[in-house]
Amino acid sequence: LSLEATDTMSLAERQVTELSGGQRQRVWVAMALAQETDILLLDEPTTYLDLAHQVELLDLLAELNEERGTTMIMVLHELNLAARVADYLVAMREGIIVAQGEAGAVLTRPNLDEIFGLKAEVVDPFNDGSVVVVPHPRGASIPE
């Protein structure tokens, strides 16, 4: 089931050392899913994956959370993907929690500037409370 869910069935007979970075990442996630634990700790599970596979993997993890009640704790540096799937975000800088809560409360212009030194707009493109971070172009004049 975990091989099917991560689309890695065709890789089952191959050595991990023969796999690309994205294939390897999906195999590691399949191995974690096969454990059927109540809690999954994932460190950058979307690393090496193209955008379509990132979304697919995070949708799978969200599905596991909804259907099995599996708690997911993961590190994600891709803010828009984190905002898309997380019920609760914790933003840290140098090991200290700077902000926590729902995506809209954490991903604000002041927080992005404080945490990442990033000048950005935070928009709700679907008018449903979801947020997307849009970085300002380098050297752009930034309205207050």
Task: Locate the predicted segments by residue.
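Catalytic Walker B motif of ABC-type/P-loop ATPase nucleotide-binding domains
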Residues: 40-44
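ABC ATPase nucleotide-binding domains
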Residues: 109, 115-144
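Helical segment within the ABC ATPase nucleotide-binding domain
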Residues: 55-68
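Conserved ABC ATPase signature
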Residues: 15-19
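Conserved ABC ATPase "signature" region
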Residues: 1-11
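Conserved catalytic motifs of ABC-family nucleotide-binding domains
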Residues: 36
